[in-house]
């Protein structure tokens, strides 16, 4: 494969490679066979676990893992065929399976290896576009599209290598390698070898490295932006807890509380004033009564409410403590100065959240008309006191309003947008960023393993182009085998970087996956029977 030649002699018509027999002692052969067999077994088991995990665990059926599944298929082919055939070729020192088997093996080996590179390239572009174009690209990022990209990766790899490997001898008219050697015929020219190394390894690795650097920078930038967003949310939360500073105090007129009969007469007079607007005298008298009614019941609120975007939790709103002079009598002819405290709730109409507009106690008729309109509840604590207040000419007394803090649960119908929306959006961004970072970590591990395992062999390819005898045969074997080891490392990278893969591997290796599925089924059946 690497182009090395062996000294042969013929014994009874059968070629014997003395150099191959002398190169490796018995224990060396046993050691090489055991080590390579173990690595091959690990590669097969690891990549089969990836496939089974993808099959049995629905959480792993994501678009990104479809690419990992394709990579596992390529690695499985290498673990089953390439590793074992190449080990046999090394230990025997020559190819004994014939030229057709050699060409088929080389075609399968190079197509699978190039498919691994193409899959890594697709994964890198997928991660890059997911990070840099989250809105436009993710809408198109479907399993069907992933399947098309995977199919193209394998198709391109097949077109690049299979026809040239299988048909080269027919194009040039003869086989250009000896029958006991197994290597690609058209790579006997140093310039072609150099060009294929550049195209198959160095260019893809350079592109993947550039993409990963951009992915890393963009991920760090989004992490910083998320930290700034969380900081602004903390500032808003702190401002929300601060008490309102802007308070406007006004006063209102308080009249002696009338008896039940007097209130009924006032209401009748107020109602009659609306019906008799054409009579001048009656209208004047009714208007005076209505004015007394409205003046006595006029009240002004304070504008000490937090802004709408800060209404994430029930806030502490001002409650007005009103001083009210009561002249209610216990019996005819006898006044009572008894102090009484009463708490009432007044529903006042709100428009455009203008809390500075004066509100009114409404008559029953007006309240009925406003029943279907949006209102906000205010609580008033009426404290009856016997001290003197300023009395007006119509018997009403001017009373001050003193604000005090009292927790009030706002009516949900009066709230603006969902108060937890900002927090939910931040949490969603954080979850997306965590997933992106995990995917980037998986990509970085796979890319690093690929570069470490493939670089030595491709460096030797470049060196051999200019100096054919500078690379020892042992280094050729070791470098080529190291490329195969990449297929063993990839499943380990999945398990180390993805917790779901790791847990699924563990359950499958311990033969507990079926038990887990049964337990989950029994759990859901038990929950479905609950009332």
From Swiss-Prot:
Residues 53-65, 126-145, 214-442, 498-531 are cytoplasmic. The modification Phosphothreonine is found at residues 500, 504. Coiled coil: none annotated. Residues 267-287 have a biased composition (Low complexity). Residues 334-346 have a biased composition (Polar residues). Keywords: Cell membrane, Disulfide bond, G-protein coupled receptor, Glycoprotein, Membrane, Phosphoprotein, Postsynaptic cell membrane, Receptor, Synapse, Transducer, Transmembrane, Transmembrane helix. The keyword Cytoplasm does not apply. Residues 1-28, 87-103, 169-190, 464-477 are extracellular. InterPro entries: GPCR_Rhodpsn (IPR000276), GPCR_Rhodpsn_7TM (IPR017452), Musac_Ach_M5_rcpt (IPR000502), Musac_Ach_rcpt (IPR000995). The chain crosses the membrane at residues 29-52, 66-86, 104-125, 146-168, 191-213, 443-463, 478-497. It is a multi-pass membrane protein. Residues 259-295, 327-346 are annotated as: Disordered. Glycans are attached at residue 7. One of its GO terms (molecular function) is G protein-coupled acetylcholine receptor activity. It is found in: Cell membrane; Postsynaptic cell membrane. One of its GO terms (cellular component) is synapse. It comes from the Eukaryota. GO terms for biological process: adenylate cyclase-inhibiting G protein-coupled acetylcholine receptor signaling pathway; chemical synaptic transmission; dopamine transport; G protein-coupled receptor signaling pathway, coupled to cyclic nucleotide second messenger; gastric acid secretion; regulation of phosphatidylinositol dephosphorylation; transmission of nerve impulse. Disulfide bonds join 102-182. Belongs to the G-protein coupled receptor 1 family. Muscarinic acetylcholine receptor subfamily. CHRM5 sub-subfamily. This is Muscarinic acetylcholine receptor M5. It comes from Rattus norvegicus. The lineage of its organism: Eukaryota, Metazoa, Chordata, Craniata, Vertebrata. The gene is Chrm5.
């Amino acid at each position: 494969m690497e182009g090395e030649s062996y000294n042969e002699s013929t014994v009874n018509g059968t070629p014997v490679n003395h150099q191959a027999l002398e190169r490796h002692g018995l224990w060396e052969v046993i050691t090489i066979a055991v080590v390579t067999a173990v690595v091959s077994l690990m590669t097969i088991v690891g990549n089969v676990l990836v496939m089974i995990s993808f099959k049995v665990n629905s959480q792993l059926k994501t678009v990104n893992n479809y690419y990992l599944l394709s990579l596992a298929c390529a690695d499985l082919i290498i673990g089953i065929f390439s590793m074992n055939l190449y080990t046999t070729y090394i230990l025997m020192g020559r190819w004994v399976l014939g030229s057709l088997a050699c060409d088929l093996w080389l075609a399968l080996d190079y197509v699978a290896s190039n498919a691994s590179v193409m899959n890594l390239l697709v994964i890198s572009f997928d991660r890059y576009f997911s990070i840099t174009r989250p809105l436009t690209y993710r809408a198109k990022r479907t399993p069907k599209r992933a399947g098309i990209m995977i199919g193209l990766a394998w198709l391109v790899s097949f077109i690049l290598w299979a026809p040239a490997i299988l048909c080269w001898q027919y194009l040039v008219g003869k086989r250009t390698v000896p029958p006991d050697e197994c290597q690609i015929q058209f790579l006997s020219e140093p310039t072609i070898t150099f060009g294929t190394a550049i195209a198959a390894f160095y260019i893809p690795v350079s592109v993947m490295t550039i993409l990963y650097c951009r992915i890393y920078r963009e991920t760090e930038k989004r992490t910083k932006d998320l930290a700034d967003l969380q900081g602004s949310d903390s500032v808003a939360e702190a401002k929300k807890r601060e008490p309102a500073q802007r308070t406007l105090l006004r006063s209102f007129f308080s009249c002696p509380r009338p008896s039940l009969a007097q209130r009924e007469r006032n209401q009748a007079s107020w109602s009659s004033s609306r019906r008799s607007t054409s009579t001048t005298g009656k209208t004047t008298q009714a208007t005076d009564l209505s004015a007394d009614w409205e003046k006595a019941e006029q009240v002004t609120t304070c504008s000490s409410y937090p802004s709408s975007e800060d209404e994430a939790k029930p806030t502490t709103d001002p409650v007005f403590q009103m001083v009210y002079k009561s002249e209610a009598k216990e019996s005819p002819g006898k006044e009572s100065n008894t102090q009484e405290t009463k708490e009432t709730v007044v529903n006042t109409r709100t428009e455009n959240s203008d809390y500075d507009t004066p509100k009114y106690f409404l008559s029953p008729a007006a309240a009925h008309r406003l029943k279907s309109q949006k209102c906000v509840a205010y609580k008033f604590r009426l404290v009856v006191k016997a001290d003197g207040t300023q009395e007006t000419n119509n018997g009403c007394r001017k009373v001050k309003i003193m604000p005090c803090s009292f927790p009030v649960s706002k009516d949900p119908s009066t709230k603006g947008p969902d108060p937890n929306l900002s927090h939910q959006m931040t949490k969603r961004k954080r979850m997306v960023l965590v997933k992106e970072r995990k995917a980037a970590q998986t990509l970085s591990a796979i890319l690093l393993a690929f570069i470490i395992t493939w670089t030595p062999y491709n460096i030797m390819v470049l060196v051999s182009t200019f100096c054919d005898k500078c690379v020892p045969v042992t280094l050729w074997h070791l470098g080529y085998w190291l490329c195969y080891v990449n297929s063993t490392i990839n499943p380990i990278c999945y398990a180390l970087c993805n917790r779901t893969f790791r847990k699924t591997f563990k359950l499958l290796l311990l033969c507990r996956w079926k038990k887990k599925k049964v337990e989950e089924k029994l759990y859901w059946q038990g929950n479905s029977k609950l009332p």
